[in-house]
Amino acid sequence: MRTLVVDASVAVKWLVLEDMSDVAKELYGTGDHLVAPRLITTEIANALARKTMQGMLTRDEAKYHFSSLPQFLPDLMDVDELIEPAFENACTLRHPIYDLLYLEAARKVDAQLVTADRRFAAKIAGTDLARHVTLLSDWRPE
């Protein structure tokens, strides 16, 4: 069993039907140890609230989906020790720190970050950091 870090762009696909939800659910079903920084709960809550405001979910549906997140990700990492290196990379790349926190979590546990965020993957392409990132569309079970 390997450890993988997932970000909110993947985890939200476990909760609500989106493009690539089938692949995200396959990833969850592998039995790999999936972890994320604690920040993911805020990002998932934001994504579900946005879907509620857009009329894609009722408030009760969003609350139900949010309450089920711990069954998917019981191990959340504290962000305090990830902040400094994530901040440095965010400044260097001129990119929001949120994505870099997930990347730093992957580096800390010597794992791959699986993301559906193509913009982030494109931003780090060609850097040494890219070797820690796998797009959900490129992910394959071992």
Report each predicted region and the residues it spans:
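Phosphate- and divalent-cation-binding pockets in alpha/beta enzyme and binding domains
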Residues: 23, 43, 85, 122-124
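Active-site neighborhoods of divalent-metal-dependent phosphate/nucleic-acid chemistry enzymes
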Residues: 74-119
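Acidic, PIN/NYN-like endoribonuclease modules and their adjacent C-terminal/linker elements
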Residues: 1-3, 103, 107-142
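Short loop->beta-strand "edge-of-pocket" segments that line small-molecule binding or catalytic clefts
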Residues: 31-35, 70, 112
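Active-site-proximal, substrate-binding regions of enzyme catalytic domains
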Residues: 45-77, 83-85
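Short, conserved alpha-helical segments within structured domains
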Residues: 40-41, 61, 82, 102
